Structures are given as C-alpha cells and as structure tokens.
C-alpha cells in the first residue's frame, strides 16, 4: 500500500503508551510549538535524483512523534518489517543498495531520514534547540511511532549503522517485544551505562575532558572528532566550507572507505589506564578521527580530496550518488545532524539520566555485528571487532567482517551485506 498511512491511535494515546520510556518534558512541549516545519525541498529533484534502484521509492509519513518522516521503502507493505537506521553524516538513502535484496527475501523494508536529518521535518533547527528532543530514548520513540504509523506491532529486524546503532540498540533493549532482532553496522551495540554497585563508585579511568586536554598537548595539538562535531564551531564551519558540499562528501567518503591508504592493515586500539597514554594511542588514527586542533573538518577534507581519475572510476559511490548527499545537506543544513553529537557529549544530563534507567539491562534478542575490515571505527572498540559480544548480549550471533569495505559497508559491498542480513533473518 502506497501513500501515507493513518496511525491506529492518536498522538495522545501513543504518548501515554510510551510513558515507560519517559514522558515529554514541559520544555520539550514548548519547543515542539516552535519547530521549523518547512524546508526548501520543493526546489530539489525527487529524493535520490534518479539514482535509486528499481523497487526503492521515497515516501512521507506524517504524525510520527511530532515529525513528518521522509523514508525509502521497498517490498510489499504487510510483509514482515525490517527497519534500517542510518548514521552520520548519512541519510535513509545510504541503505538504497541493500534494500532490494532484503525485500526480495520476503520483507517490507523501510529506511527513514532520522530526526535532524534530510527531508524529515518537525524538529527545532536552531543550535540551542531543546536537548530532550534529541535524547536516545526520544529518538527510539520516533521509531516506535513510525512502526505504528505503518500499521505494525513488531519489527523482524532493526538495523543501525554508525550513530544509528545507538537508537537500534536501545530499541532492542527497551522494547524486545517489538524489535525482535538487532544488527549493528560499523559500531558495536550500545550497552546502558553502569551505576555504582554495593555503594562503591568504580575507580580508575578518565573523563572525555581529561582526554581532550591531553590531545591538546600533542605535537601538533589534536582533538577527537566527536568533540569537534559537538561544537558550535563545527556548525559554523559546515555553513562556510571552502569546498562544495558534494566535494566535502566525496573526500569524507573516500577517507573513511576501504580504499584509503591509512585504513589498511589495522590493529585495534589498546585500552590505556591514563588519559595521557590514551591520547598517544589514539593519535595512531588518521586525522579524520583525531583531528589537528587548528583545522575544522572541511579544511581537513580539502587535503584528502581524491584524484579526478579516482572519482571517474569509483563505481561504489558515483558522482551522481555523491551529489545526492551534497544537495540534501545543502538544503537541510548540518545543525540537526550535529545535535546527535552535541547532546550526547555536552548535554549529558537528560540523555544519561534516561539511559541509567536501564543500567544492568542486556541485549536479549538475537544480535549480529557487521563491520568493514578496513574501518577504523570498528577498531576503536577495546579489543577490536573480535571483542564484540563478550559482554552485554545474551544471544550474540557473531561478527561478520567485510573485506574491501571501510565505514560504509552497505554502500561499498551491498551484495555481501544484504546476504549477511538475510542469512541472519532466516537462521534465527
């Protein structure tokens, strides 16, 4: 069934039913009245600009936890549902290449532009937006509302790539009755933070601020990319970049992809007892992860722009596909996407308070981890990809490493990734 689908119950009923996840605060309600609901998308080509595979189509779904959600869909609505959540800086569009194969296996597959991204509207576009709108659990509420709006009570598999794994993981933790399987891509599942046990706080370790201070002492001074993306400077940099938006995405995809020279023969980062030692260990990573302190991300990417020959011969990320990201982010801006970093890193209060409600919970649905073999992101995990699944899961089904893929395996090697996902669905 195409077109929009009316939710089975009102927004008031939905919010009451979702009270176990925490109600909206008064501040959230006030901010909701001030959100920007219009964007210059009517001036753009159709979503995907004629690069979508046959059978993958865009659709708008209204009344989704205050949002109108733009999404891609494939397969017949009414079949078992697979929900694909993108990461940063991506869109639902990033799943286009795996959707047909999953749909052909008998599923209805949807990939939304998440809150803050793309053509999904209804969120506050200001830098000082209410942080509670971007907490992990409110973004889980977005997904529960979308599932309901589509006429479903269960999701056969929820998949999260990069930042999307945070939403997907918590969806599986708080609603295992609804989200029956979990796959995370390029990032291990998020486990709820721990509370002190037995009246004694856990000692040792260091804070993000202490690590950042040690990065600043390196020669040349460095900073963690997450600390950068959480800053107002990043928001301003992305509004005034020296290159075109398409050129930024070309360089960003290249540097984090499987062909980039610095992404070969990776060894996982070693856990270190002090911030000073950790800063030195992290400095092994390329500058797109541990950045020079005097450069923003656009300036960093200028130095990594691939050659014209590479661009002309790049089959997994054509110029037409690159231009889709360029045009969509030019229209939407970056502020909403950056809120996902900002409110996790500089406004921990509401987010951590909600997450601590689930301290001690494990992921109790069948779970799979997929990562590119040439992805530094997967090697930032203590112990690397091989360590995923040792704690926090009760039904971990394994890790699948994808060769000749970096941080974008669903776009770099879609046939392999879709086969892994379908195999997981059919075997559990």
How should each PLM-predicted stretch be described?
Residues 6-15, 115:
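Twin-arginine (Tat) signal peptide motif
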Residues 399-405:
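Short glycine-rich catalytic loops that host catalytic nucleophiles or stabilize transition states
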Residues 1-9, 20:
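N-terminal secretory signal peptides
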Residues 29-33:
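Boundary at the C-terminal end of the N-terminal hydrophobic targeting segment
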Residues 65-73:
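A short loop-to-beta-strand scaffold at the N-terminal edge of the catalytic core in hydrolase folds
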Residues 39-58, 69, 117, 121-159, ...:
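Flexible "cap/lid" subdomain of the alpha/beta-hydrolase fold that forms the substrate-access gate
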Residues 405-413:
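Catalytic histidine-centered segment of alpha/beta-hydrolase-like enzymes
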Residues 72-123, 161:
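Conserved HGGG/HGGXW glycine-rich cap/lid loop of the alpha/beta-hydrolase fold
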């Amino acid at each position: 069934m195409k077109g929009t689908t009316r939710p089975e119950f009102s927004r008031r009923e939905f919010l009451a039913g979702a009270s176990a996840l925490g109600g909206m605060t008064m501040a959230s309600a006030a901010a909701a009245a001030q959100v920007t609901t219009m964007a210059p998308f009517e001036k753009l080509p159709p979503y995907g600009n004629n690069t979508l595979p046959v059978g993958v189509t865009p659709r708008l779904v209204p009344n989704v936890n205050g949002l109108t959600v733009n999404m891609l869909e494939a397969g017949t609505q009414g079949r078992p549902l697979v929900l694909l959540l993108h990461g940063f800086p991506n869109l639902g569009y990033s799943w286009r290449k795996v959707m047909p194969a999953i749909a052909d296996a008998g599923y209805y597959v949807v990939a939304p532009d998440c809150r803050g991204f793309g053509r999904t509207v209804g969120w506050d576009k200001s830098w000082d937006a209410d942080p509670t709108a971007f907490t992990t659990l409110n973004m889980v509420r977005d997904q529960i509302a979308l599932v309901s709006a589509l006429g479903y009570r269960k999701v056969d598999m929820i998949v999260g790539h990069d930042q999307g794994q945070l939403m997907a993981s918590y969806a599986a933790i708080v609603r295992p009755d609804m989200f029956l399987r979990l796959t995370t891509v390029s990032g291990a599942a998020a486990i709820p933070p721990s509370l002190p046990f037995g009246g004694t706080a856990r000692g040792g370790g260091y804070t993000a601020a202490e690590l950042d201070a040690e990065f600043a002492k390196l020669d040349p001074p460095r900073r963690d990319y997450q600390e950068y993306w959480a800053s107002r400077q990043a928001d301003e940099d992305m509004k005034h970049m020296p290159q075109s938006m398409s050129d930024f995405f070309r360089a960003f995809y290249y540097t984090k992809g499987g062909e980039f020279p610095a992404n070969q023969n990776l060894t996982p980062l070693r856990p270190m007892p002090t911030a000073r030692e950790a800063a030195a260990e992290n400095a092994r990573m390329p500058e797109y992860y541990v950045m020079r302190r005097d450069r923003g991300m656009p300036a960093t990417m200028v130095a990594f722009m691939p050659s014209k020959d590479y661009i002309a011969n790049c089959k997994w990320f054509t110029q037409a596909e690159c231009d889709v990201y360029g045009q969509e982010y030019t229209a939407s801006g970056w502020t909403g996407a950056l809120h996902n970093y900002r409110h996790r890193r500089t406004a921990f209060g509401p987010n951590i308070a909600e997450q601590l409600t689930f301290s001690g919970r494990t992921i109790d649905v069948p779970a799979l981890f997929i990562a590119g073999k040439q992805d530094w992101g997967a090697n930032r995990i203590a112990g690397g990809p091989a360590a995923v699944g040792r704690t926090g899961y009760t039904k971990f089904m394994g890790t699948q490493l994808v060769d000749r893929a970096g941080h974008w395996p669903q776009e770099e090697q879609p046939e392999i990734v879709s086969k892994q996902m379908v195999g997981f669905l059919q075997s559990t």
